[in-house]
Swiss-Prot record:
Organism: Schizosaccharomyces pombe (strain 972 / ATCC 24843) (Fission yeast)
Listed name of the protein: Ubiquinone biosynthesis protein coq9, mitochondrial
InterPro entries given in the database record: COQ9_C, Ubiq_biosynth_COQ9
Annotated localization: Mitochondrion
Positions that bind a 1,2-diacylglycero-3-phosphoethanolamine: 181-184
Lineage: Eukaryota, Fungi, Dikarya, Ascomycota, Taphrinomycotina
GO biological process terms, semicolon-separated: ubiquinone biosynthetic process
Amino acid sequence: MLTLRSACQLTTKNLGLHKCISKTVISALGRRGYHSENYETSKISGKKALILENALEHVPQLGFTEDAIVQGGQALGYSNLSKALFPSGPMDLISYFFLKQRYALSSLKPHLTTIPETSGRVVQLIWSRLQGNRDIVQHLPQMIAICTYPSNLRKSLSSLAELSDEILYLAQDKSADFQWYTKRAAISAIYSASELFMSRDTSPNFEATYNFVQHRIQHAKALNDLRNDVLEWGSFQLNAVRSILRSRGI
C-alpha cells in the first residue's frame, strides 16, 4: 500500500528520484545482455512458478496484490506458504508477469522476417509486448507505482533491460557496442513511456498507443538519434508516479 511517507519520498522534486534512477540505470542497463534463449529456462521454477502462474489468473480481478498470490497458492493447496515464498509480495508477481511476456515475444520470429527495416521490427515488438497488458490494463497504474518504489526500482529496471535486450536481438540489430548501449536505453525509455500512455488510453483497441509507439520510434530517427529519449526516461517515470499519486488524492 502506498503510504504518505513513500509518496513524499517519490515526489521529492526531480533531484532525489533522478539521482536514484541514474545510479540504478547505470547498473541495470549498463551491461550488454543476451537473448532469452541464452538465459536459463526460467529464473522462477518449481513450486514458486506454479503459484505465480495461478496467481496471474487472479490479477485481472485482484490486481498485482498479495491477495492474488494467496489465491494462487490456495488453488494448489499452499494456503500458508505464499507470503513466505514471496518476500517482495506484489513485485514478485510483477516480475513473473514481465518474464512470461518477454519470453512470449520469440513467437514473433516468423512474422518479423517479413518486416524489412529494423525500426519496423522494433515497433512490432514493442506493440506486441504492450498487447500483453490488455487483460490487466486497469491495473497498469498500480503496477507502475509498485515498480517505482525505491525498494523495487533495481528489479524493475533489470526486467526492463532484459526486455530491451530481447527486442534488439529479435529485431536483428547489428550495432557496435557503444551504439547498442544507447539503443538499449532508448528502447527502455520508449517502452516505459508507451506503457504509461497505454494506462490512460481509451481509444478503440488502443490505437492511440500504437500511434504513440510509432511516433516515438520515428522521433528517434530510425534509432540513430536517441539521446533525447534516454534523457526523458527519468522524467516519464517521475510523471508516472506523480499522476498515480494525484489519482489517489495524495
